[in-house]
C-alpha cells in the first residue's frame, strides 16, 4: 500500500493539485493507494465517489485541521504493516507527523520551490529543515528547486529530481474545438497563457508585448486562462493599452475548452519572474502545451529550463526585460518557427507522461 498525505488534491485546481492527483492515480497500477486530503469544498465528496482511490478527507478550521490530519495519519501508519511508502506533498504535511511512528516506513517529501524559499536560519527555514529530517528522500521538481534546497540547508544526499508528470493528450471534442476557434477567430498569432494571475507569471509584460506587437500583427489575439489576485490590475492595464479586442481573460472554463484553446494556439507564453520569495519551480503548463504540439516561451528565473528545451521546443527569455520577451515572440512567429518548435515539443513532452514518471517513483521507493 502507498499512503499519500496532501494539502493539495483534485477537484481543487492548480499545478500541485494536478501533480498529487496524477501521482496517486498512477500509483494505483502498482498497488492500493490511501489518500489523506484536506476537505475544502462540497465538490470534494462527489469527486471522490468517482475515483478508484481510497480518499479520506479531513475537515475543520485550517489552523486546527493540520493537527487533526497529522493525528489521523500517525494512527493509520501505526496500525498498518504493509505500507510501501508514505508520500507528502509539502513540508507542512510532514511537520507534525511523529518521527518514531513514520520511521517504520519509507518517507518521501516533495518540494516545489516557493514553499521552501525562506532565508537561511529564519524561523520558517528552521521548521523546514526539522521537518525534512524525518524524510528518507526529498523529491525536487526541477534542477532549480534542488539547488535552492541545497542553498537553504536541505541535505544534498537526500534530494532526488523527479519532474512532474502529465496525462497523455486527449482527443478534443468537436464542440470545444469549434468554441475555441470562435474565440480566436481569424487571428494571428494566437498566443495563450494558462496560469494564475500572479505577478511572477509575467502577465503585465505580456500585455505590454501584445501592445507592441499589434502594430506589426494587427490581427493578434492573446488569451489568458486563470484567476488570481492580479485580475483587476491586469484588466485595468488592458483597457489602458487599448487591447480590449485583442485580449480575452477567461476563468473557470471547462478543461476540454482549455485544452482546445491550447491546441489551436501558435504559442504558449509565460515569461516568469521572481516576485519576492515567489518563484516558478518548474512550470508544468509548458509541458502540457508541448504535448499538444505548442511551443513555449518561459522566463529564465526558476525551473522553466527543465520544461522547455531552449532553441528546440521553445525559448527561454528574461521575463523582466520587455525587449527580451518581444524579440523572443518575434523569433518564434517569424518564418513559422513555432511549427518546427511545436513538433519537437510534442516529442519532448512524452518523457513526462505519467506512466514513465511514476516508474521513477517506484524505482526510488525500491532503492530506499
Spell out what each predicted region is:
Residues 6-13, 19-67:
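N-terminal strand-loop element at the rim of the active site
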Residues 88-94, 111:
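Short His-centered aromatic/hydrophobic patch
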Residues 139, 183-201, 207-210:
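Conserved donor-binding/catalytic core segment of Leloir-type glycosyltransferases
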Residues 144, 165:
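Carbohydrate-associated surface elements
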Residues 189, 219, 337-351, 363:
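A short, well-ordered alpha-helix in the C-terminal region of glycosyltransferases
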Residues 225, 235-256:
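Nucleotide-activated donor-binding/catalytic signature segment of Leloir-type glycosyltransferases, i.e.
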Residues 263-278, 294:
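Acidic donor-binding loop of glycosyltransferase active sites
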Residues 309-311, 315-322, 331-336:
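Conserved acidic donor-binding segment of nucleotide-sugar-dependent glycosyltransferases
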